Amino acid sequence: MLILGSGSARRKELLESASIDFLLVPSDYNESQVAFEGDTLKYVETIAENKAKALLHKYPLDVILTADTVVEVDGEILGKPKDIEDAQKMLQLLNDKTHHVYTGVCIVSKDKKEVFVESASVTFNKLSTLDIESYIQTKEPMDKAGAYAIQGIGAKLIKQYDGDFHTIMGLPLKLVLEKLKDFNIVPKLK
């Protein structure tokens, strides 16, 4: 059985859209235990892997899938905003700039482990203070890395993106499905 170790509604929706059977069990791993030391890829890999390790001992016979997504702009890492003020700061940082989104993924069983990172770049439109405030009022940015959802209302903030759309959403679905085959997890036929 596949265990999705995530509280992310987006990751859940993506796996469901691929007709994968899974059990949703958010990992209780505290991400703040990992300090950012300048290497974004290593950072998201480590968090994804630690989330998986926290679940593997509870589900030793299953396959665990975990992920972590961050936004990097001007050398700064942006996770989920802590509050409205934090969301405003993040959106202002992203305003009229190109940034990078990194999603680290860990798929692990008792016999095997795959850890990888996918990235994409996103360019924001030039936003007014009112644009930012209006978007924050929707509440959409509050549980998203970088304080926006490319697949939601936040699409209006985006000028362009380069890379995999699902990576920006938080789970590089095509690559995850390929890797899951190695763990004998395949989509069910409808």
Swiss-Prot record:
Active-site residues per Swiss-Prot or TrEMBL entry: D68
Site annotation Important for substrate specificity: residues: R10, T69, Q151
Location relative to the cell: Cytoplasm
Reaction catalysed by this enzyme: dTTP + H2O = dTMP + diphosphate + H(+); UTP + H2O = UMP + diphosphate + H(+)
Chief location of this protein within or outside the cell: cytoplasm
Family designation: Belongs to the Maf family. YhdE subfamily.
UniProt xrefs under NCBIfam families: maf
Job description of the protein: Nucleoside triphosphate pyrophosphatase that hydrolyzes dTTP and UTP. May have a dual role in cell division arrest and in preventing the incorporation of modified nucleotides into cellular nucleic acids.
Name of the protein in question: dTTP/UTP pyrophosphatase
Organism: Acholeplasma laidlawii (strain PG-8A)
